[in-house]
Amino acid sequence: MGVVIVTGGSRGIGADICRLAARRGYSVCVNYLRGEKEANEVVEGIMESDGRAISVKADVTIEADVSRMFDEATSKLGPITALVNNAGWGGQHGPIESWQIAATRKLIELNLLGPMICSREAVKRMARKHGGQGGDIVNISSAAARTGAPGVFVHYAATKGGLDVFTTGLAKEVAKEGIRVNAVRPGYVRTEMYEEDLRQSPDWVRANIASIPVGRIAEVRDVSAVVLWLLSAEASYVTGSIVDISGGRDTQ
């Protein structure tokens, strides 16, 4: 199938994308920054099922780290054919007056600049004009990009809105290079980030969950399955698309 790099692949949605990608035949680079133990467990699980995987520590906001990650993945697994920009952070909840600028800057760098740096490196290697064979990029956005999340995390929502615009623009820019770029916009997913949202803003979270038409929050596989479809040949005519995965809530 090829080689996929999954940023933030040590836990949650990222870890499940890694596992499902391996089952579909991909060789997987599990990126992490702090979750070394968890990343290694994902790799071990893949290898126990006769898959190919490595873990690579890299800060996606640092160009040199990203370049090194791509180099290591290429040397150990082969040419990169797919990238999933999953690494992200929810930040602290609260109205705009409560924001700490240093933390907000970190949020923007991780959620928006990080995917840009990783995508730039991927395009340099995938684009036909650079000797590549094309490839696929999927960005993990959020339903917050549509709602704005007023009073809770407008700064987080803004980073994801920016990621959506980046997705549609880059898709048009690199389509002739054989590269497809898409995104998914999950709503609430049963992950550590969801638990943190519930801890910080329990009433807001519960009210939003009550308005989900299908009557439940998502499991990680609900998201990873769509990501793998977007990476597959079945989605070969799909680019510049943003798929809502929110149980019918926050959709057009």
Label the model's feature ranges.
Residues 10-11:
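Conserved glycine-rich cofactor-binding loop
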Residues 93, 228, 239-252:
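Short C-terminal tail/terminal secondary-structure segment
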Residues 119-120, 168:
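A short, exposed helix-loop element centered on a Lys and neighboring polar residues
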Residues 124, 172-176, 236:
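Alpha-helical segment proximal to the catalytic Tyr-Lys
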Residues 78, 175, 180, 238-240:
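Short, small/polar-rich loop/turn modules that mediate ligand/substrate recognition or access, typified
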Residues 90, 132, 138-162, 167-176, ...:
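Catalytic loop of short-chain dehydrogenase/reductase
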Residues 94-99, 103-108, 208:
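Substrate-binding pocket helix/loop in short-chain dehydrogenase/reductase
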